[in-house]
């Protein structure tokens, strides 16, 4: 058994600008809660989005759960836009085309939980 406190999870990838053609539209930071190999079943990260930054439309090969930890953001699929804030939990089924990110006037952060081995395929350029 392990206990994690959000404030104790190391920022493993400082806020960087992702190169053109990658999944994010701007600067993000990543904290790896479960480092690769520590769980045979799950991958868990905390993703921090700068103001207005989002990821592009994409799909996952497994279900995804997002737990909003800070700021204001959106989770969007092909037919719905959900405005989210701290404490909201979003379930995204395997194969659903979607994006998530910060509102235009707020940074945003969420925990992302997926099955180990999950593949992400970017749909939007």
What does each of the following model-derived ranges do?
Residues 1-41, 122-125:
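A short, N-terminal "cap"/entry segment at the start of jelly-roll beta-barrel domains
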Residues 32, 45-60, 94:
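Conserved short histidine dyad/triad with adjacent acidic residue
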Residues 47, 91, 105-123:
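A short hydrophobic beta-strand segment most commonly corresponding to one strand
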Residues 55-57, 75-76, 92, 97-104:
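Short beta-strand His + acidic residue motifs that chelate non-heme Fe in jelly-roll/DSBH
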Residues 62-73, 78:
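Glycine- and acidic-residue-biased ligand/ion/polar-headgroup-sensing regions
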Residues 79-95:
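Short acidic-glycine-tyrosine-enriched beta hairpin
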């Amino acid at each position: 058994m392990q206990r994690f406190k959000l404030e104790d999870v190391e920022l493993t990838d400082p806020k960087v600008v992702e190169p053109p053609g990658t999944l994010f539209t701007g600067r993000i930071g990543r904290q790896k809660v479960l480092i690769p190999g520590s769980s045979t079943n799950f991958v868990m990260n905390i993703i921090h989005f700068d103001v207005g930054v989002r990821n592009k439309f994409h799909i996952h090969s497994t279900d995804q759960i997002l737990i909003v930890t800070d700021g204001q953001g959106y989770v969007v699929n092909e037919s719905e836009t959900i405005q989210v804030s701290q404490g909201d939990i979003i379930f995204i089924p395997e194969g659903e085309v979607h994006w998530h990110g910060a509102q235009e006037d707020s940074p945003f952060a969420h925990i992302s939980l997926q099955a180990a081995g999950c593949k992400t395929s970017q749909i939007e350029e």
